């Protein structure tokens, strides 16, 4: 389970320079269930990319705190979180259409109505569609670590991207990351700690225990059985 959604090379204004993406477009074959979900539930829960900023109150039909998840994979944990918090709104971005189809099918089956999904490049969505100071939470769980040194530049968590996320969070909003790759966790911590405007919510100024709000995935359970660690980082926008 590797969810990877943007190209982290930017100019001084935070705009993408070259389309070196942190994901590989492995669309794969849609199952009949995924195809059915895309055909039938996308018109209700799907959001097309637009050059114009989105109005969340219009999109969800109400005013409520908005959580954005970048790279939701097959959507199991995103649907679980949305179902557990009906008083909040959730927007998920995933570039792989089978995952989007699976998420739509699961949301429909669970009767989740406070979830919208996109199938697009996340950095473009952040730049073009997400208003500044609008998000209560941004979630990035298990992005591709690109562990080979020559691929490190493909990692989604870089200073310009973290600064972009900061601009989209409300004051008091939180950027929550999780990874099972220790070197990437250290990289995330270094990047986030270098940015003025974020406060690490860890009492030890590094990692936080997994919050109850983040479901344990099957991928994570398998990792625990194999002795793999998982690192959660939570940074609040304080200025």
UniProtKB/Swiss-Prot annotation:
Entry-linked SUPFAM superfamilies: S-adenosyl-L-methionine-dependent methyltransferases (SSF53335)
Record note on quaternary structure: Monomer.
NCBIfam families: tRNA (guanosine(46)-N7)-methyltransferase TrmB
Keywords in alphabetical order: Methyltransferase, S-adenosyl-L-methionine, Transferase, tRNA processing
Full protein name: tRNA (guanine-N(7)-)-methyltransferase
Pfam families found in the cross-reference section: Methyltransf_4
Binding site for S-adenosyl-L-methionine: 69, 94, 121, 144
InterPro entries documented for this protein: SAM-dependent_MTases_sf (IPR029063), tRNA_(Gua-N-7)_MeTrfase_Trmb (IPR003358), tRNA_methyltr_TrmB_bact (IPR055361)
Keyword tRNA processing included in the entry's annotation: yes
Record: residues binding substrate: 148, 180, 217-220
Gene Ontology MF term list: tRNA (guanine(46)-N7)-methyltransferase activity
EC numbers: 2.1.1.33
Annotated function: Catalyzes the formation of N(7)-methylguanine at position 46 (m7G46) in tRNA.
Positions of the UniProt region annotated as Interaction with RNA: 150-155
Domain of life according to the entry: Bacteria
Reaction(s) this enzyme catalyzes, per UniProt: guanosine(46) in tRNA + S-adenosyl-L-methionine = N(7)-methylguanosine(46) in tRNA + S-adenosyl-L-homocysteine
Entry's Gene Ontology cellular component terms: tRNA methyltransferase complex
UniProt xrefs under Gene3D superfamilies: Vaccinia Virus protein VP39 (3.40.50.150)
Positions of the catalytic residues: 144
Source species of the chain: Salmonella arizonae (strain ATCC BAA-731 / CDC346-86 / RSK2980)
Stated family: Belongs to the class I-like SAM-binding methyltransferase superfamily. TrmB family.
